[in-house]
Amino acid sequence: LDLFKVAGNQRWAGGGTFDMPIVVMTPNGAGIRGSLYHSHSFESWASRLPGWKIVMPSNALDAYGLMLTAIKDPNPVLVLLPKALLRQKGARLIPGEPADADELSRMI
């Protein structure tokens, strides 16, 4: 818990003079028939963390994009990854890249 308390406040305690680029990714949620101790949801707790950005993707493509964005963010980011999402297959295309091989080769 100290990580969450300290990291969220450090950037603002220093007057924004230094970045705190931390990404914490954790499984979240129920719906996969987990037992009592494996079906916790942290959304309400996480929403009260000062200084943290909280994201939760709804599909595999969103998870990919949110992770890339979280890594580049100078603030601490908590990625709550729904457990049911871990069982989905994502698209084979990378967001922002053309599907046509000829167009991709012209870009390179």
Task: Identify the residue ranges that each predicted region occupies.
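Conserved thiamine diphosphate
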Residues: 1-108
